[in-house]
Amino acid sequence: MQLENIKKLQDLDVKGKTVLVRVDYNVPLKDGKVDNNKRIVASEKTVKYLLDNNCKVVLMSHLGRPKGKVASEFSLAPVATEVANVFGVKVHFASDCIGEPAAKTIAEAKNGEIVLLENLRFHPEEEKNDETFAAQLAKNGEVFVQEAFGTVHRAHASTSAVTKFLNGGIGYLVQKEVQFLGDALAKPNRPFAAIIGGAKVSDKIMVLNTLLSKVNVLVIGGGMAYTFLKAQGYTTGKSLLEEDKVEEANKILATAKEKGVEILLPVDHVCSTEFSNESPVMTTENANIPEGQMGLDIGPKTIALFDKKLLECKTIFWNGPVGVFEMSNFEKGSFAIASSMVEATKLGATTIIGGGDSLNVLKKAKIKTDLLSHCSTGGGASMEFVEGKELPGLTALAK
């Protein structure tokens, strides 16, 4: 995805204007308060730039999956309080994202203040990329800024159709995301390693095939590793296995060999008879998993093997945990990958986390995101970017 044809925030004439910004404030709430404000803080540079330019800043976002109906538990009202805390200016909350409630609230706000509109997904038209709805959203501003990297892979009214009615460009967060991911893939410092974890091969086939033409080392962990091990003739016990993807795994292994890509798979495992933190744990001697046991994390030999290889690399991309890190018995492997990423960064490597569960690993391991080069805010979007897919929220702005 090239940025040449897309205007950047700093190229837009915004001074003193009402600017409509699509943000990703899909944040976790607990007891009616924002539990983690990282996504709000991530938009800080763009919002502050607009406030400094005496703009009236109108923010729109989704929250959760209300399925096109108004549902109080998905209201952005508690988020407005946190937005005020983060930016230190008056925040007006509009009880709807279109029509009279939005227009009235925006009219009451002064330049240098923020308006947060109610959840976009209270309207079924949002996810249908409906043009009539997008035209109503566009009435809320004079310029449009796309600052929600986490949703640019969706063709929704607030990311795609709205650009037919308002000129605009991308904010600093989206610029940073596209630049980091784009540079890492187009001109990485080598050796370049990708760590791909997660449960299913079927979810990651496209990304694995794309990465094979870009990386020097491909590290495979998590539930999907067992399908690859089965393809290599190892026993997998009662581990998660996609029998119908064994052939696909074989093809990926053959392509890697052909392209000279080194593939690293687990050489030992932490297992249990049940998918539970309470059942007894055993560590295998090698890559075979005994009958009745299921692999739930990588073992100590694998941790050492992966760590040694990652510390030799100059660019590392990580998406997906290598074990069931939500359970304390099976968190060590994913925590070790996170630590290796931090160490590699200290040694001068560019380290990128592709959003999603890998970020939750950092949070659980109490590792600060700024110890890595870049932590993507969009799991699905970053993976589709890596796959080379078109991102509707960006192509809509390429005029």
Swiss-Prot record:
**Listed SUPFAM superfamilies:** Phosphoglycerate kinase
| Entry-linked PROSITE patterns | PGLYCERATE_KINASE (PS00111)
The alphabetized UniProt keywords are: ATP-binding, Cytoplasm, Glycolysis, Kinase, Nucleotide-binding, Transferase
Q: Which residues bind ATP?
A: 204, 295, 326, 355-358
Entry keyword annotation includes Transferase? yes
Q: What does the record give as its pathway? A: Carbohydrate degradation; glycolysis; pyruvate from D-glyceraldehyde 3-phosphate: step 2/5
- Quote one Gene Ontology molecular function term: phosphoglycerate kinase activity
Give the UniProt family note. Belongs to the phosphoglycerate kinase family.
Quaternary data: Monomer.
Q: What is this protein called?
A: Phosphoglycerate kinase
**Taxonomic lineage:** Bacteria, Pseudomonadati, Elusimicrobiota, Elusimicrobia, Elusimicrobiales
